[in-house]
């Protein structure tokens, strides 16, 4: 989720008026903070949605803890009732998407499943990898890895200005941000990163 918009605002500044940022935040109270921050910064190139991305359209329940960065989709009916929608139903197919940034507290696989058509026009995904959070939803990094590979991505860890490809058997940190990239040459050209051998 976009939370209060720290990354959303930074990305909006980076792409400028010719670019567009689309952000999603399911928690109604946090969504109001997001909206307020966008208004306060007078950003016109941001579109926001008060819902959770999922692999199905409907409703779900969302936690409401004080540490709002830890809120997540619940498997039970406790919490705040929220709308869920598939990424594919936003019909974002007119223009290529340079970057999909995703941090949904372990719900990543379901977001990707609901956006399988959209993934065809995305070159790069920045996502949080936390195996213990995936277990809350009864899948593993191995399942996520396979799904991304089947959709023509290669997975990389990064440090400083270097990316290094990882494999299903690679040892990862307990919590780590990763990149899923289709066109490596384009990514390296646009970012000035280098590829580790």
Locate each region found by the language model.
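Phosphate/nucleotide-binding beta-alpha loop and adjacent structural elements of enzyme active sites
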Residues: 2-197
């Amino acid at each position: 989720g976009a939370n209060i918009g720290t990354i959303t605002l930074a990305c909006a500044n980076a792409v400028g008026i010719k670019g567009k940022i689309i952000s999603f935040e399911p928690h109604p109270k946090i969504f109001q903070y997001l909206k307020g921050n966008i208004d306060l910064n007078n950003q016109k190139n941001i579109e926001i949605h008060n819902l959770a991305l999922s692999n199905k359209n409907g409703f779900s329940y969302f936690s409401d803890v004080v540490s709002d960065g830890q809120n997540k989709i619940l498997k039970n009916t406790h919490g705040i009732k929220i709308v869920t929608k598939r990424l594919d139903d936003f019909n974002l197919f007119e223009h290529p998407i340079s970057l999909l940034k995703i941090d949904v507290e372990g719900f990543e696989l379901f977001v990707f499943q609901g956006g399988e058509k959209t993934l065809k026009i995305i070159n790069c995904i920045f996502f949080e990898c936390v195996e213990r959070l995936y277990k809350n939803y009864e899948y593993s990094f191995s399942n996520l890895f396979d799904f991304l590979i089947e959709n023509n991505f290669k997975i990389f860890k990064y440090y400083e200005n270097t990316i290094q490809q990882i494999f299903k058997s690679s040892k990862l940190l307990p919590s780590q941000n990763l990149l899923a990239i289709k066109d490596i040459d384009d990514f390296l050209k646009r970012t000035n990163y280098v590829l580790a051998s």
